[in-house]
């Protein structure tokens, strides 16, 4: 229900701002923590026939839903369903794969004004170009929310509308707000749920901006803020808690004690950091070294961090974990740095870099405390070599 609302609202705001399919898919893709398929490519995979049936069902049954009218299909979707342009299962939907005169595969995009297919064009927005080099998703979201171009306006309007809608669905579809975030992450592949995004933008500040823009958060949100509760989630002793609207207090998320979320530990359990790595206290006498570089590649800062982690662990702790909560464990050595040294024919620096890495691996292998690696995703080159040297891989 929340996901379909988000899609239908995107249709509405897209038409209001005069955006096209390529532009919306760039705004609603990986830059904001959504799947690469974004909005329209996802619909092609799912099928517009499925979208039509679900939206129709929500419209018919949601007689008390304040956003009921939004679930009525726009004309372009009705036309596409009538023509059987329902997505991948029909070989065409919002996108269509074809071949040009030379036999080369070409992706065409549907022009929703003419209902004709046109060559796919790269969407260009100054704000999105600024976001691209920013690694931290939370920073990207904050930057886009303040952007003054159409991408920023689209993000604000769709976010404010979504925040209003999900706040009104508590406790109708869920007693606990964290379950809505869980559902959007698991069902739609979002990295962050609506309430998590709201927290990033600032619960109080965003509620005020929503009101100014004509969106009204649910009463329980305003009551929460009036009581001095400034966020939907909080971290207590390294464990995340959610705001419970019935008791008006923060409660622990059931099962959260079985997982270690490094982001939740960073505020209170940070022991040491540099620009490429962070050392955190996991409790029970265990340290964790977390890589913080692009794709967690290994450069000088990461090597320094690993040596510092071993030094600290051998002195005051019982063990060390090498792990992170990123998409990949490590893409290996920082090849950009290697390439730069090779291009400059600075072989002394290159040799020193290799030697330092190898010495660090041997230090991991023969350290006085147990070292455990927790690989996932890409574990390439130096990342793999690290796993081969530690005492245990989990």
Could you tell me what each predicted segment is?
Residues 1-327, 336-356, 362-369, 376-379, ...:
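N-terminal glycine-rich phosphate-binding loop for ADP-containing cofactors
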């Amino acid at each position: 229900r929340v996901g379909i609302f988000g899609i239908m609202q995107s249709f509405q705001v897209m038409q209001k701002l005069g955006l096209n399919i390529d532009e919306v898919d760039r705004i609603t893709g990986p830059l904001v923590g959504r799947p690469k398929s974004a909005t329209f490519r996802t619909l092609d995979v799912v099928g517009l026939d499925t979208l039509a049936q679900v939206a129709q069902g929500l419209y018919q049954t949601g007689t008390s839903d304040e956003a009921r009218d939004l679930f009525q299909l726009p004309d372009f979707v009705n036309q596409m369903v009538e023509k059987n342009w329902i997505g991948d299962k029909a070989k065409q939907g919002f996108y269509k794969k074809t071949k040009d005169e030379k036999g080369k595969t070409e992706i065409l995009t549907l022009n929703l004004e003419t209902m004709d297919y046109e060559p796919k064009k790269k969407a260009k927005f100054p704000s999105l170009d600024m976001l691209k080099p920013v690694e931290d998703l939370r920073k990207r979201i904050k930057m886009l929310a303040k952007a003054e171009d159409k991408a920023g306006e689209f993000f604000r309007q769709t976010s404010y509308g979504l925040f209003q809608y999900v706040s009104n669905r508590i406790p109708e579809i869920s007693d606990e707000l964290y379950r809505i975030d869980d559902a959007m992450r698991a069902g739609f592949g979002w990295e962050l749920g609506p309430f998590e995004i709201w927290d990033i933008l600032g619960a109080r500040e965003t509620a005020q901006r929503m009101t100014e823009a004509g969106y009204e958060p649910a009463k329980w949100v305003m009551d929460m803020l009036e009581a001095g509760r400034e966020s939907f989630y909080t971290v207590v002793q390294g464990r995340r808690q959610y705001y419970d609207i019935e008791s008006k207090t923060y409660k622990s998320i059931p099962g959260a004690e079985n997982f270690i979320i490094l982001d939740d530990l960073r505020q209170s359990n940070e022991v040491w950091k540099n620009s490429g790595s962070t050392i955190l206290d996991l409790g029970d006498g265990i340290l964790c070294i977390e890589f913080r570089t692009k794709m967690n590649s290994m450069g000088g800062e990461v090597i320094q961090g690993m040596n510092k982690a071993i030094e600290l662990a051998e002195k005051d702790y019982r063990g060390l974990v090498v792990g992170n909560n990123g998409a990949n464990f490590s893409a290996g050595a920082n090849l950009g740095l290697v390439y730069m040294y090779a291009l400059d024919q600075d072989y002394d620096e290159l040799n020193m870099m290799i030697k330092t890495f190898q010495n660090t691996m041997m230090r991991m292998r023969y350290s006085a405390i147990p070292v455990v690696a927790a690989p996932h995703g890409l574990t390439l080159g130096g990342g793999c070599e690290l796993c081969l040297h530690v005492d245990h891989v989990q």
